[in-house]
């Protein structure tokens, strides 16, 4: 059984992931570091609201920042965060039925192989 402090930290991480905008921001950040304006555009929200979400993610140690001139750039904090976000989205894709997005290339290849065998 994990220590109580670790469970509390895990609960905080899940609390941060309970917001769709924050999950979308983390998903965009899987592709690499981005400034606030690009993140806002990518998720279709205003920069002020996105900054508030990013502050929460930073305080939960899910993202890191880097300042360059008058811009703040955000990135995923660690490979653990990256894996958590990917696993959450992949789990959702598997739960919704059909062929998950991350398997569509595999399904296409399998279909082509089956067609070639006929």
Q: What role is predicted for each listed range?
A:
Residues 1-9, 80-118:
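Amphipathic alpha-helical dimerization/coiled-coil segments
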Residues 49-50, 68, 105-106:
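Intrinsic low-complexity/disordered segments
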Residues 53:
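Residues within the DNA-recognition helix of helix-turn-helix
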Residues 33-34, 58, 89:
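Residue-level detector of secondary-structure transition/capping positions
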Residues 58-68, 75:
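Beta-hairpin "wing" of winged helix-turn-helix
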Residues 56-57, 75, 98, 107:
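Alpha-helical and His/Cys-centered functional microenvironments
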Residues 8-48, 72-80:
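N-terminal helix-turn-helix DNA-binding core of bacterial DNA-binding proteins
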